[in-house]
Amino acid sequence: MKYNIVFLFAIIASLACLQLTFAAPAASPLANPGASPDAAPNADPLADPFLPIIGKLLSGLLGKK
C-alpha cells in the first residue's frame, strides 16, 4: 500500500512538470481582444486534456471505480 502512495505522488509531480513545461504563458486581455470575459485569467487550455487522465490515474491508484 505504501508504494501506491509513492507512485501517486510521482505521477502528480511528473504531470505538474509537464504542465509547467508545455503551458503557454497567460495572455493579457489586450493581446487577445476576442477572449471571453468569463474565462479565468490564468486558465491554460492545454491543461484541459490532462484532467480526465489525472482522474483515471487517481481512481486506479486509490482502488475506486
From Swiss-Prot:
The modification Leucine amide is found at residue 62. AXPX repeats lie at residues 23-26, 27-30, 31-34, 35-38, 39-42, 43-46, 47-50. One of its GO terms (biological process) is defense response to bacterium. It is found in: Secreted. Residues 1-23 form the signal peptide. GO terms for cellular component: extracellular region. Disulfide bonds: none annotated. Keywords: Amidation, Antibiotic, Antimicrobial, Fungicide, G-protein coupled receptor impairing toxin, Immunity, Innate immunity, Repeat, Secreted, Signal, Toxin. GO terms for molecular function: toxin activity. Expressed by the venom gland. The keyword Zinc does not apply. Residues 24-49 form a propeptide. Belongs to the MCD family. Crabrolin subfamily. This is Vespid chemotactic peptide VT1. It comes from Vespa tropica (Greater banded hornet). The lineage of its organism: Eukaryota, Metazoa, Ecdysozoa, Arthropoda, Hexapoda.
